[in-house]
UniProtKB/Swiss-Prot annotation:
GO terms for cellular component: extracellular region; extracellular space. Glycans are attached at residue 72. This is Growth/differentiation factor 8. The gene is Mstn. Homodimer; disulfide-linked. Interacts with WFIKKN2, leading to inhibit its activity. Interacts with FSTL3. One of its GO terms (molecular function) is growth factor activity. It comes from the Eukaryota. Keywords: Cleavage on pair of basic residues, Cytokine, Disulfide bond, Glycoprotein, Growth factor, Heparin-binding, Secreted, Signal.
Length: 376
């Protein structure tokens, strides 16, 4: 019996020697390696989530703006089309780049498509605007369908008057084209005003055309265009209707403002993390979208904005949007897939952009910024 016991001891010692020295810290190192591996996996997961979020944003913007593809407008074309006018400069200069704040309330329940606030429409030529001498007259405006279904708050016609060398009085007249009358009349007056100009640079002048626009929207067939005249005391026309050399961006244009209906908001809470965070739970991470990196020159402003994204694990009862989510899992743990880390609070961004018809639109795109993340 003793011999058998000694034999077992020898065999055990031989196995220990064959296995090599025993490291007392081996268990802790293994746990540390597992932890590091988990962190690496979390980083890779977040990287994939970032990429997916950016691709989703590109698709959402085109869809919400009702664009099948990104407008193909070159930088040279943009430089020619972009008016050097006060209302547009004001939008760009005072543009409120999307802030990453944590204010109470948000547009959680929001319409899918963009809400238009301001539309800047450039003139186009029309066959009807032809005089007997064959010279086209400005201007004919085609209106976006967005104006048709929104209440017009303001409509301004902006015209640029060339500089003068001496003080002069300018008589501005806006005429609306109509179908030829029996007496040959083809125009009816819209607005007329008198301006005193001093030597120096040219000036932009705005004219209220809200009533005319509303009539055009009610009776589209009556929209045959307008003619602009701005004559000085010597009979010289100072209005830029067809820009010449060095007059890019001085075309006449219409600035139309429409109503925007605010929606109710609700509060929510969640975790905020940075890219170096070791937080494994559902959290909001920063993400800046750069439109110039996409080659999307058709977006005038903002050139970039903070979109953010959600990533992390969802333990049951942690940041769940709906209380019943936990109860459903408890009742049927195998039949429930469990909660996922998703945005629970989002807010819109304002955007100034060219649409497919080369019109400049200033509108609000809903649900483009992740403000809070949670499990649902």
């Amino acid at each position: 019996m003793m011999q058998k016991l000694q034999m077992y001891v020898y065999i055990y010692l031989f196995m220990l020697i064959a296995a090599g020295p025993v490291d007392l810290n081996e268990g802790s190192e293994r746990e540390e390696n597992v932890e590091k591996e988990g962190l690496c996996n979390a980083c890779a997961w977040r990287q994939n989530t970032r990429y997916s979020r950016i691709e989703a944003i590109k698709i959402q913007i085109l869809s919400k703006l009702r664009l099948e593809t990104a407008p193909n407008i070159s930088k040279d074309a943009i430089r020619q089309l972009l008016p050097r006018a006060p209302p547009l400069r004001e939008l760009i200069d005072q543009y409120d780049v999307q802030r990453d704040d944590s204010s109470d309330g948000s547009l959680e329940d929001d319409d899918y498509h963009a809400t238009t606030e301001t539309i800047i429409t450039m003139p186009t030529e029309s066959d009807f605007l032809m005089q007997a001498d064959g010279k086209p007259k400005c201007c004919f405006f085609k209106f976006s369908s967005k104006i048709q279904y929104n209440k017009v708050v303001k409509a301004q016609l902006w015209i640029y008057l060339r500089p003068v060398k001496t003080p002069t009085t300018v008589f501005v007249q806006i005429l609306r084209l109509i179908k030829p009358m029996k007496d040959g009349t083809r125009y009816t007056g819209i607005r007329s005003l008198k301006l005193d100009m001093s030597p120096g640079t040219g000036i932009w002048q705005s004219i209220d055309v809200k009533t005319v626009l509303q009539n055009w929207l009610k009776q589209p067939e009556s929209n045959l265009g307008i003619e602009i005249k701005a004559l000085d005391e010597n009979g010289h026309d100072l209005a830029v209707t067809f820009p010449g050399p060095g007059e890019d961006g001085l075309n006449p244009f219409l600035e139309v403002k429409v109503t925007d209906t605010p929606k109710r908001s609700r509060r929510d809470f969640g975790l905020d993390c940075d890219e170096h965070s070791t937080e494994s739970r559902c959290c909001r991470y920063p993400l800046t979208v750069d439109f110039e990196a996409f080659g999307w020159d058709w977006i005038i402003a903002p050139k970039r904005y903070k979109a953010n994204y959600c990533s992390g694990e969802c333990e049951f009862v942690f940041l769940q949007k709906y209380p019943h989510t936990h109860l459903v899992h408890q009742a049927n743990p195998r039949g429930s897939a469990g909660p996922c880390c998703t945005p629970t609070k989002m807010s819109p961004i304002n955007m100034l952009y060219f649409n497919g018809k080369e019109q400049i639109i200033y509108g609000k795109i809903p649900a483009m910024v992740v403000d809070r993340c949670g499990c649902s």
